[in-house]
């Protein structure tokens, strides 16, 4: 079918499926990062479509920091069982031994050790030469300038000044031994595209995306959900039950909730049409310092 006859979402879907199939054909040992969020759910759905009725020909990898929302872990395990996924879960053993804690050590150190170093450990351990990620260009300025095929050196570092041209949807997959590519099939999607596609395709997502009464503590203007007993509650903290949901998901101490009454997908989509703020405003790791996301990516972060 001609691209001109496809709807906007059908064009995005076709492009993403093309990228996923290209990587599966060109690389020896690809892996799909699975962070359990809405973008990962869409990417997994696209991968299942790309190889239907066969199984996805590569494993999924979740780098678990040990601080994800309980509902995320439950959803991850249920999804893996439901679709018979080859799911690898990796936790940085050094970070666990050191007792790295986002409340004690801060978001920067926690992210570096449990996420960046944990990811590099897993990629080295299993020898993956390509890794899919669900990042989109509309999320954040460093991601806006990153290619679909993002080259990484032997230390998994990204050099934004040394990117390969991608003309006419032709991607350069050549890497030397020890080098790798991070692949972003959802690069050209927007947050609104993601939500509309989830609605049209009836894709399961973590319930945290829907508004519900949840216990939250407000710190520095950000509502943090009290997800387990590890969260320190000081005498100045007031735990309130509020109607909130999450636009983005990560480690619960580093992810802010938003006030919302959206309990259905159409209501979330309507909310997205009216919002003027970034979905990542609630991710504390993006506010460590100016340009923090680009610095993290240079060091090997996804």
UniProtKB/Swiss-Prot annotation:
Subunit structure: Heterodimer composed of CysD, the smaller subunit, and CysN.
Pathways per UniProt: Sulfur metabolism; hydrogen sulfide biosynthesis; sulfite from sulfate: step 1/3
EC code(s) of this entry: 2.7.7.4
Lineage start: Bacteria, Pseudomonadati, Pseudomonadota, Gammaproteobacteria, Aeromonadales
Name listed for the protein in its UniProt record: Sulfate adenylyltransferase subunit 2
GO biological process: hydrogen sulfide biosynthetic process; sulfate assimilation
Protein's job: With CysN forms the ATP sulfurylase (ATPS) that catalyzes the adenylation of sulfate producing adenosine 5'-phosphosulfate (APS) and diphosphate, the first enzymatic step in sulfur assimilation pathway. APS synthesis involves the formation of a high-energy phosphoric-sulfuric acid anhydride bond driven by GTP hydrolysis by CysN coupled to ATP hydrolysis by CysD.
Record family assignment: Belongs to the PAPS reductase family. CysD subfamily.
GO molecular function: ATP binding; sulfate adenylyltransferase (ATP) activity
CDD domains: Sulfate_adenylyltransferase_2 (cd23946)
Enzyme class: transferase
Assigned keywords, A-Z: ATP-binding, Nucleotide-binding, Nucleotidyltransferase, Transferase
Species this chain originates from: Aeromonas hydrophila subsp. hydrophila (strain ATCC 7966 / DSM 30187 / BCRC 13018 / CCUG 14551 / JCM 1027 / KCTC 2358 / NCIMB 9240 / NCTC 8049)
Gene3D superfamilies for this protein: HUPs
Catalytic activity line of the entry: sulfate + ATP + H(+) = adenosine 5'-phosphosulfate + diphosphate
């Amino acid at each position: 079918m001609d691209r001109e006859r496809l709807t906007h979402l059908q064009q995005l879907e076709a492009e993403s499926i093309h990228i996923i199939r290209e990587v599966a054909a060109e690389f020896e040992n690809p892996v799909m990062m699975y962070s359990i969020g809405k973008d990962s759910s869409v990417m997994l759905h696209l991968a299942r479509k790309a190889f239907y009725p066969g199984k996805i020909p590569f494993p999924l990898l979740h780098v678990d920091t040990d601080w994800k929302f309980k509902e995320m872990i439950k959803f991850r395990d249920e999804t893996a069982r439901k679709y018979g996924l080859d799911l690898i879960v990796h936790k940085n053993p050094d970070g666990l031994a050191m007792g790295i804690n986002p409340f004690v050590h801060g978001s920067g150190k926690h992210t570096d050790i449990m996420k960046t170093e944990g990811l590099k450990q897993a990629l080295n351990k299993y020898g993956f030469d390509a890794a899919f990620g669900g990042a989109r260009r509309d999320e954040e300025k460093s991601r806006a300038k990153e290619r679909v095929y993002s080259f990484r050196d032997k230390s998994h570092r990204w050099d934004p000044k040394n990117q390969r041209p991608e003309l006419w949807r032709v991607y350069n997959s050549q890497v030397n031994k020890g080098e790798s590519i991070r692949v972003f099939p959802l690069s050209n999607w927007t947050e609104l595209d993601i939500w509309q596609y989830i609605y049209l395709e009836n894709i399961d997502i973590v319930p945290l995306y829907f508004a519900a009464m949840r216990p939250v503590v407000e710190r520095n203007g950000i509502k943090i959900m009290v997800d387990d007993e590890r969260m320190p509650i000081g005498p100045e903290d007031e735990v309130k039950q509020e109607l909130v949901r999450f636009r983005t998901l990560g480690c619960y101490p580093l992810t802010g909730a938003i006030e919302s009454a959206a309990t259905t997908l159409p209501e979330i989509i309507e909310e997205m049409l009216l919002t003027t703020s970034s979905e990542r405003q609630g991710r504390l790791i993006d506010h460590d310092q100016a340009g923090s996301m680009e610095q993290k990516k240079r060091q090997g972060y996804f």
